[in-house]
Amino acid sequence: MPEWIVEEGIGEVRAALVEDGEVLEARVRREGVVPAGAVLDAKLVAVAPRVTVEADGAQFLLPRGVSGVTEGARLAIEVTREALGGSEPWKRGLARRTEAAPAPAPPLAEGAKGTIEAWDELLEEARTGIVRFEGGELRIQPTAAMTVIDVDGWLIPAKLAQMAAWAAARAIRRLDIGGSIGIDFPTLHGKEERREVDEILNGYLPHPFEKTAINGFGFAQIVRPKLRPSLLELAENRARFEARALVRRAGRSIGGTTVTAHPAVIAAIDEGWHKRLERQVGGAVTLSADPSLAMSGGHVH
């Protein structure tokens, strides 16, 4: 039976729904980012061009707008999507006005605390955006408009689309992909072929979601709730992503150790993380920058 495992890490909290050692679903909550579900006391700082409030040192957009208040007014908000990271205005956190009292966000998941053994495999999928399955592979790319899933393989189109539908539904859960998702299947000429692929998606995707039927060109669009960045979006900030992964590996050491990585990754390990890592391993941790290493090539010894 699948069980949630919650891993309290340095820089992030990780949660995974695991069955027989396989991660079925994963979530990440970054340290220092206000999570979805939190209710905050906020200040309205702008009504144009976007309704913007400020709370807990961060700015949030209110897509539904707000009426009856002017700039400088105080109001309660509920965070509906965490900030995605990045300087673009649309990547700020999203919120809505509420009458509820300030309260923390609910837990990332309800489960036992422990170590997620298959986490490194999941990170590799997030790094590359490539998910392999029998007969082909998915290439997944986040864009400003949607996350695009392209299907490639060597099976006949109908069989490839069926296998890809299962793999895409699995990847959407594993990589925590929400919001608008486009899947570009092979062209399917028959209605029955398209119906079979639709049924696979409907059967494997967890609710709630909305989905268009697959059109004659093999394209389907899915819309799921989006509470936080997907693992793919987190991987776009590569230095920070690799820094968190490396600190996680280093945390398994006992006593003094040396962490060697690309200079950008070393620079992304802030002082607070470094000190906590030393306390966790029970010894001095030396950070060593090596420009010859790839961003994902860091090691601990």
Question: How does the language model describe each region?
Answer:
Residues 1-301:
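DE-rich acidic low-complexity regions and acidic surface loops
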